[in-house]
Design a protein with these regions (language model features):
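Polyanion-binding surfaces on beta-sheet-dominated domains and ring/shell assemblies
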Residues: 1-120
């Protein structure tokens, strides 16, 4: 991870300690931080439901920064509720909302350069 670039991005988007969660192996920007970045860059996101079932959902997000409307990014978010984390990746029954949240986060992080630095 390029620490200098990461510090530069934190300052650019005015991220505070409560906007970031440091996991043992990686850094996670909280929902509050994601929305702060989205607002600052004026990122527009539309969603397409690819699959939505009782315990599984996939959303496709199309996103762009308003100052660069020709650069459209497409990415996905998914959530699977299973018996445990070995079989799934979500511990709640609101899998559609989790898939949407994951698609949103991934799109914002990719458009702003965080994702390539290992921030999720």
């Amino acid at each position: 991870m390029n620490r200098e670039k990461l510090v530069e991005l934190y300052k650019k988007y005015d991220l505070q300690k409560d906007d970031v969660y440091k996991h043992q192996h990686y850094v996670i920007i909280t929902r509050q931080g994601i929305e702060k970045i989205q607002a600052k860059e004026n990122i527009t996101i539309t969603y397409e439901v690819v699959k939505c079932e009782t315990n599984f959902a996939v959303f496709k997000a199309k996103a762009f920064i308003s100052s660069k409307p020709d650069t459209v990014l497409e990415t996905f978010g998914s959530a699977l509720k299973a018996a445990n984390y070995k079989d799934g990746n979500c511990n709640s029954w609101y899998v559609a909302e989790m898939a949407e949240k994951r698609a949103l986060s991934r799109a914002v992080l990719k458009l702003t350069g965080f994702y390539e630095l290992g921030v999720f």
